[in-house]
């Protein structure tokens, strides 16, 4: 995703079904069908009234039709990390609209409450990745990758 983001591309539908791992453990991101080019000065990538993406993994700003950039993909990856370390999605009650509302509210249980065996700091890393305010998330995939290195 770092390379895509460096080219100004935001995936907007990052989810487990779009992450493939080959026999050499190399990750491949697929289905850029709703991806959009992001350039400095763009105010938004989606027309008002249109919701594009998978509700379980959508960033709050994407749900609200606000300006979307690479931090929306960081949010989606944070949701996937949450599922990996807890075994459950952060938000799953109700229909798609209810799940999207829960993402906007941002009141997921802390991963360490669900899985007390997490290494110190990993729960905070996941929560930071899923911050409702995108300025409080990791600001790039590279920054998130560097933070994850401690947990190899």
Language-model features and meaning:
Residues 9-16, 21:
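Catalytic-loop of the protein kinase fold
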Residues 6, 24, 39, 93-94:
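Short connector loops in the HATPase_c
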Residues 56-152:
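C-terminal lobe helix-coil module of Hanks-type protein kinase domains
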Residues 24-60, 64-67:
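Activation segment of protein kinases
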Residues 1-9:
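Protein kinase catalytic-loop region centered on the HRD/HxD motif
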Residues 2, 20, 28:
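Conserved catalytic/dimer-interface elements of ABC ATPase nucleotide-binding domains
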């Amino acid at each position: 995703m770092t390379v895509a983001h460096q080219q100004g591309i935001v995936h907007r539908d990052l989810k487990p079904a779009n992450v493939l791992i080959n026999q050499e453990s190399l990750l491949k991101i697929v289905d850029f069908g709703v991806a959009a080019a992001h350039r400095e000065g763009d105010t938004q990538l989606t027309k008002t009234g249109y919701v594009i993406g998978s509700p379980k993994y959508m960033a709050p700003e994407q749900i609200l039709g606000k300006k979307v950039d690479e931090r929306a993909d960081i949010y989606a990856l944070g949701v996937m990390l949450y599922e990996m370390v807890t075994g459950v999605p952060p938000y799953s009650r109700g229909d798609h609209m209810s799940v999207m509302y829960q993402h906007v509210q941002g009141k997921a249980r802390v991963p360490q409450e669900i899985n007390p065996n997490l290494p110190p700091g990993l729960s905070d890393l996941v929560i930071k990745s899923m911050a409702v305010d995108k300025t409080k998330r990791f600001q790039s995939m590279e920054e998130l990758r560097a933070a994850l290195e401690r947990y190899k």
